[in-house]
């Protein structure tokens, strides 16, 4: 399925995997073709997605509008009611995720999108 799957956390994880690190990626994606396509994209870059939680109605999306003449580029986010937005405390098994982790990376937007995610 065509699309660009990303975001700051995915981009950081992919960069670390590209440099040879063992990266386990944690998020929540819906069942169905869109969720599968997102996971396939992450796997293609060598990310371990075994801790990804499945469920919710949709992927969060963002739209990029290129700059034209004197106007800057714009990004519009549509995250409300996405799978990650509706992630609840206890859905991620943090004990397992962090058991062998040397480093944990999380951006500030993660907590802002889903207060219960952490």
Predicted segment positions?
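Substrate-binding N-lobe of the ribokinase-like
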Residues: 1-72, 80, 96
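Ribokinase/PfkB-type carbohydrate-kinase core domain
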Residues: 41-43, 49, 68-118
């Amino acid at each position: 399925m065509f699309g660009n799957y990303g975001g700051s956390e995915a981009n950081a994880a992919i960069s670390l995997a590209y440099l040879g690190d063992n990266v386990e990626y944690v998020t929540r994606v819906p069942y169905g073709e869109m969720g599968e396509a997102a996971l396939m994209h992450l796997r293609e870059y060598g990310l371990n997605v075994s801790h990804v939680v499945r469920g919710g109605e949709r992927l969060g999306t963002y739209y990029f509008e290129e700059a034209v003449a004197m106007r800057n580029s714009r990004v519009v986010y549509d995250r409300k009611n996405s799978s990650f937005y509706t992630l609840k405390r206890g859905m991620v098994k943090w004990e397992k995720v962090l058991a062998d982790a040397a480093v944990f990376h999380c951006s500030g937007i993660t907590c802002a999108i889903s207060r219960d995610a952490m």
